[in-house]
Amino acid sequence: MKRILLFLFLSFPALSQSYKVSVGSNITSYEFANSAGTNPISLRSESGLALGLSREFSLSKVFVLDLGLAYNQFNSVGDIQNIPLAYSTDFMGLSLGVGPSLNLGKGLSFSAKAVASASSMVKGNQFIQNRYVDLFADKQFNSLRTLYGYSFEINKQINEQVGVFAKYQHLDSYNFGSSTLNFIPSTFSIGISLRK
């Protein structure tokens, strides 16, 4: 699996445009639904770290494709029957984005992309009644998680090789069944881009 990811990340040199590194914050909402279709837990959004490493390819003069690795913390706090609880999870995976990039002049550009992401939990805990519960045994958390959404990005080219950018991304997961958990993260990030 690692070799496939490395091949995808390093291939297509003729189409290569830039490497991007970003850091930011996820504001994540959890949506639980039990077999009756109701949410028995009162949860609030909580922040978590977001890191990204990607490679952007020019598909044409207007459209770009972004393929990358992502590390995300999807966290939440709340209560169930007045018992406080907190979820802390770490996910790693792949992200793919495609969309138009518009040149605004003076080194500025704006891009809007449709985004798909697939990731797996590498660590997860639930804090409830003064103890931590490992979430690896919970299939709602420890399963392949696919998310879909969009992103908006403003780029400023500093010189021919180096640029900086600010990005907003919104994703939703869609799990179906008798009892489900869906993540809805909104991510604000900044980063640096290096042209080859």
What function would you assign to each model-found segment?
Residues 16-61, 65, 187, 193-196:
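Short glycine/proline- and aromatic-enriched beta-strand/turn motifs that initiate or cap beta-hairpins
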